[in-house]
Each structure stands twice: as structure tokens, then as C-alpha cells.
Amino acid sequence: MTRSLLLILGLLVASNSFSQQKCDCSNLQADKILLQNFWTTFKDAIKNKNKTKLSNLCRFPFNCDYCILDSTKTDDKPYHKITKSSFDESQYQIFFIPRLVQEVNKHSFPQDLFIFLPYFNTVDKKCSYSFSYIAIDENAERPGMQHFFDIQKINGQFKIISAWTVP
């Protein structure tokens, strides 16, 4: 009985460790072309204020904890679930914040591939990437704020899956 339990436990541990994807900088090289395509489209959509192109780069619904508080908010959660319709109505504006526009225009590919940070998304059990920008500078009165976008490969294309903040 003890042997059977140990065997089952060993198989479960082995299965769990071998099923985890490796998410590190080597993934950046493998995904380089797709990330470049994403960034080129993203940069162009922001430059031209094209919300249709931006919506094509998002997987709906996606969570956003700093999205615009307006009449589209329907509950008291600390984040908003951004649907296609709420995006089209007003939430697309998060992509036209001057600090984001400035940061996006600073980078070009392939030399700036490092702006994407790989991580293992424990919710989706997939490798994802984050990129960020400083939304509010730190000063003596407040700690500052950084906005992040998480992207993930979905059906052979990268899509924005969430937007969040750190302070």
C-alpha cells in the first residue's frame, strides 16, 4: 500500500515538473518575429489612433485595474473586465495616454526585444510576456506608478490579455 502511494505521488510530481513550460529569455528568440509583428502593429495603431487595430490586438474580455472610471463600470471590483463593447465605447483611451505613446515611440525592433519580460502565467498555464512604462514619476509625496500590459500567444498571434498597475 505504501509503495503504491509513493509510486503515485512520484508520478504526479514528475508529471507536474515536466509539464511546466520553460519561460525565460530563450523564448524571446523563438517568438522574435511574432513579437516584432505585434509591436509594429501596436506602434502603428497608437501612432494613428486606430482603435480598430488596437482592438484586434486584444483578447476580450481582459482585466484592467487602471482603466478609465466612467459610466461603463458596473461593479466594485478592483479591476474592470474590458469587453469589446466597453473598449469601443471608451476604454481604448488607455492606449493614448501620452506617457505610453512616448514609451512606444522610443522602441523599435529587433534591437529593443528586451522590453518584453517573459513569465509563466499561472492562470492560463502558458508563457506570457509583460511590457511596462512609468505612468507617474516617483517624488517626495508619492511613490510613482508603473503600468503593465501582459501579452500571450493566441492562435499564432500575440494578444493583450491584461493591463495592470504597480505602485
Tell where the protein language model's regions lie, with residue ranges.
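Positively charged n-region of N-terminal signal peptides that target proteins for export
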Residues: 1-6, 19-20
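Sequence contexts marking disulfide-bonded cysteines in secreted/extracellular proteins
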Residues: 22-26, 66-68, 126-128
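A solvent-exposed, acidic/Ser-Thr-rich amphipathic alpha-helical stretch
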Residues: 69-98
